[in-house]
Amino acid sequence: MPNMSLTKVPMPEQDPNVRNKNFEEVALGYTKEMAMEEATRCINCKNKPCMSGCPVCVRIPEFIAKVAAGEFEEAYKIITSTNGLPAVCGRVCPQENQCEGKCIRGIKGEPVSIGRLERFVADYHMAHSNDDTIKPESNGIKVAVVGAGPAGLTCAGDLAKLGYEVTIFEAFHKAGGVLVYGIPEFRLPKAIVQKEVENLEALGVKVETDMVIGRVLSIDEIMEMGFKAVFIGSGAGLPSFMGIEGEALVGVYSANEYLTRANLMKAYLDDYDTPIIKSKNVAVVGGGNVAMDAARTALRLGAENVYIVYRRGMEELPARGEEVHHAIEEGIIFKTLNNPVKLIGDEDGRVCKMECVEMELGEPDSSGRRRPMVIEGSNFQLDVDTVIMSLGTSPNPLIRTTTKGLEANKWGCLVVNEDTLETTRDNVYAGGDAVTGAATVILAMGAGKQAAASIHERLSK
């Protein structure tokens, strides 16, 4: 009989007053007993709506049934038949809007905790299994992947399993893309990402780091090296700013730069070459997951006061509810219905104040959210010594501007065939944030799978 409890088995977590001073993972993971208990909440319904919410088509009820039976390795095999990054997805996917958002159990009570179960299965496999990956027999066909983020890693893995000789060209010195430079250690430990990359390498995938495509090599030069197809999964790393006075002051960062310095380049250690200046009062402008990551990172780096400055209300925050909840628990101060209009510097050129205006919400705009409007005469100043702009990102134009015939839309996103993900260049495919603009890890992975299938169909003819 299914477990008809209306609530999920709680996830063990670090105490907020302890974790806000360290970079260790916040969520500690289920035990075997917890996972099996939660798995019994799945009623294995006939239509399986949860699967329609998964961009990589994980056979969710099947793997959960194996967890309930204690057959964790069988569950892992089911998950990894379609998802090459289960330990990542179990931690950072917005399940509440995807698989769990469609779970029948959520109609009355809480949905089954699909993400936590996926994480448990992946972590159990890492802890208890020997690496028994079998490298597929090569078909002799070379395929290049640009970018070692979620889209590129997924595309590479799917093609490698089919026997293709895949080389990933990664601009940074570590593979993982946003998984290593954008998402903090306390949400996604880098050892997890490294293990997933090693799993790909065991399949025969080669990873070339420090390869900025468009500078070191062009797409045309890659094709001349004998690669029969190229997948561009270069992400969206070009940050947006407000265009207000003072954004060039010392102490003003994009969230992208701030998190990259902290996550990838260990800027919190004094002996590294890319330090983040010490901060007392930090303001993060924006309300998405990246803003929460930046704010929570600033707190861990020693800031006394960290503010989220957002022009709409708490109900309109685009960040995951779990991330907002964790930020509040840790002491982040939310200044909603506020918007910066000017940054003010001291005599040394470092930001020292942020001038804001209060906002009120009017009628809904084209996105369906109520439009924020300035309350005249409501200006006030906030003492700050660091400002982090978390206003979204767009694709870097480097590849587009160095590749003839590669078309992009007005936002700089590559134009692709929706069915095949082929660009306007023959045998050049693209997916993930390079096509959609900044989106989720799992959507990028779905694009990587789609492109791999298209490349295989083309090259196997």
Positions of predicted regions on the chain:
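A conserved FAD-binding loop/helix module that cradles the flavin
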Residues: A294, A434-K461
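FAD-site-proximal beta/loop scaffold in flavoenzymes
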Residues: A248-S279, P364-A438
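Residue-level detector of alpha-helix initiation sites
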Residues: G84, G149-A151, K174, G288-V290, ...
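Glycine/serine-rich phosphate-binding loop and adjoining beta1-alpha1 elements at the start
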Residues: S52, V56-K135, E201, T209, ...
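N-terminal Rossmann-like FAD-binding beta1-loop-alpha1 element of flavoenzymes
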Residues: I141-T167, A291-L299
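Glycine-rich dinucleotide-binding loop and its adjacent helix/turn
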Residues: V121-E137, K195-R215, F241-L301, N409-D419, ...
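Rossmann-like dinucleotide-binding cores of NAD(P)H-dependent redox enzymes
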Residues: I168, F172-L203, V207, A295-K342
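Feature captures the FAD/FMN-dependent oxidoreductase FAD-binding
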Residues: E74, E137, K142-V146, Q194-I244, ...
